[in-house]
């Protein structure tokens, strides 16, 4: 198996070769992953918002952004600058502390969740042993911020939006966790790196989507609900409750909610790609590609090329799912709140439990095919 590139080890060794002590080299490395994570997530949001505008324009037979830079690529930057310079209004009868903390509590857990996302064998900020459940734990903090924002606004529509967000998150976190548990059962690990490694070696046929089709659908539906994307955007339904918990917000506080929403969408798409679509794994096994090219899998140049293409493969799979999510937003009608809760509690939860039991039975009956 291609072991990939040890990014941290290579960086520290390079600094030590320059005469920098090991302790200093490690201290220099420590903030770099967080900085790279912030830059990567921000660029990802810019791309996702541009895609949103272009795909929505295509669905409505419009051209979409085209004047701000080539193909309108600078529109997300212009939107961000507009929000930065807008006045930050705090309602007179609101709770200013909770009103300010709400959007911050929403955004921080989403960015922290990128710590466990691997883009390659050793290209991961923190290979935590319980990485997937760390993400679920962090995502459960978000509804607190949304409820806080809705309550602090002193607005009935904001409060309704916050309550809807909390109810929706609780309803779909359990099916999401059950789908993840089935994957962990097959992989014998909760580490995202181990889960991808368990899928590698057989190309597209080894991906978990074939062994867990029901789990894939549960995870994808629950992830869309957690991201509050149509048809599950009940907490901010314009026709019913103006803008939900965002009603009284303006300026960058308003922008933080949208930033959190898009970063969450990208994060969820990355995790679907990692858990079910092989992550950085190629559709064709690497040993076959190396054989066709007449090179060894251990060749350093081949490893660098495959590691680089592996990052591209992970991002491509994720943005393919982002495209599907955006397309769903502009083609599927919104469900009612009772339908939303019924889907979570009365359908996805029992189906997730049955899927988990079925996975356990198949793992016992066919250990080689289901993780050993």
UniProtKB/Swiss-Prot annotation:
A biological process (GO) annotation for this entry?
Answer: photosynthesis, light reaction
Q: What top-level branch of life does the organism fall under?
A: Bacteria
* Main location class: membrane
Question: Where in the cell is the protein located?
Answer: Cellular thylakoid membrane
Q: What class of enzyme is it?
A: translocase
**GO cellular component assignments:** plasma membrane-derived thylakoid membrane
Q: Which GO terms describe its molecular function?
A: NADH dehydrogenase activity; oxidoreductase activity, acting on NAD(P)H, quinone or similar compound as acceptor; quinone binding
TM stretches of this protein = 27-47, 97-117, 128-148, 166-186, 204-224, 249-269, 308-328, 351-371
Classification via InterPro entries: NADH_UbQ_OxRdtase_su1/FPO, NADH_UbQ_OxRdtase_su1_CS
| Known catalytic reactions | a plastoquinone + NADH + (n+1) H(+)(in) = a plastoquinol + NAD(+) + n H(+)(out); a plastoquinone + NADPH + (n+1) H(+)(in) = a plastoquinol + NADP(+) + n H(+)(out)
Q: Name the keywords, alphabetized.
A: Membrane, NAD, NADP, Plastoquinone, Quinone, Thylakoid, Translocase, Transmembrane, Transmembrane helix
- What membrane topology does the UniProt entry give? Multi-pass membrane protein
Name of a matching Pfam family = NADHdh
Q: What is its EC number?
A: 7.1.1.-
- Family membership noted in the UniProt record: Belongs to the complex I subunit 1 family.
Q: What does this protein do?
A: NDH-1 shuttles electrons from an unknown electron donor, via FMN and iron-sulfur (Fe-S) centers, to quinones in the respiratory and/or the photosynthetic chain. The immediate electron acceptor for the enzyme in this species is believed to be plastoquinone. Couples the redox reaction to proton translocation, and thus conserves the redox energy in a proton gradient.
**Oligomer status and interactors:** NDH-1 is composed of at least 11 different subunits.
Protein name, entry field: NAD(P)H-quinone oxidoreductase subunit 1
What is the gene called? ndhA
């Amino acid at each position: 198996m291609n072991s990939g590139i040890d990014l941290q080890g290579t960086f520290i060794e390079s600094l030590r070769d320059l005469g920098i002590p090991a302790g200093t080299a490690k201290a220099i490395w420590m903030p770099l992953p967080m900085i790279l994570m912030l830059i990567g997530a921000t660029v990802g949001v810019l791309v996702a918002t541009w895609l949103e505008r272009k795909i929505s324009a295509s669905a409505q037979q419009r051209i979409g952004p085209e004047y701000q830079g080539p193909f309108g690529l600078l529109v997300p930057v212009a939107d961000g600058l507009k929000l930065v310079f807008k006045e930050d209004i705090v309602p007179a009868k609101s709770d200013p502390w909770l009103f300010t903390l709400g959007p911050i509590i929403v955004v921080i857990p989403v960015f922290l969740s990128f710590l466990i996302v691997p883009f390659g064998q050793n290209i991961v900020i923190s290979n935590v042993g319980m990485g997937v459940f760390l993400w679920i734990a962090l995502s459960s903090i978000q509804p607190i911020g949304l409820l806080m924002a809705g309550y602090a606004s002193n607005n009935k529509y904001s409060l309704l939006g916050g309550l809807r967000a909390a109810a929706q998150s609780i309803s779909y976190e359990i099916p999401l966790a059950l789908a993840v548990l089935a994957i962990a059962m097959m992989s014998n690990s909760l580490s995202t790196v181990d889960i991808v490694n368990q899928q590698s070696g057989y190309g597209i046929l080894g991906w978990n989507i074939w062994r867990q089709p029901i789990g894939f659908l549960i995870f994808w539906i629950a992830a869309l609900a957690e991201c509050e994307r149509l048809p599950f955007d009940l907490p901010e339904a314009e026709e019913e409750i103006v803008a939900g918990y965002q009603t009284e917000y303006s300026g960058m506080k308003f922008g933080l909610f949208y930033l959190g929403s898009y970063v969450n969408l990208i994060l969820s798409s990355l995790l679907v790609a990692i858990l079910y679509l092989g992550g950085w794994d190629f559709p064709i096994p690497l040993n076959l590609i190396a054989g066709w090219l007449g090179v060894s899998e251990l060749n350093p140049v081949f490893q660098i090329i495959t590691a680089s293409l592996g990052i591209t493969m992970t991002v491509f799979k994720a943005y393919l799912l982002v495209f599907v999510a955006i397309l769903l937003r502009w083609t599927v009608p919104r469900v009612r709140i009772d339908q939303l809760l019924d889907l979570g509690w009365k359908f996805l939860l029992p189906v997730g439990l049955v899927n988990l039991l079925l996975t356990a039975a198949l793992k016992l009956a066919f250990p080689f095919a289901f993780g050993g």
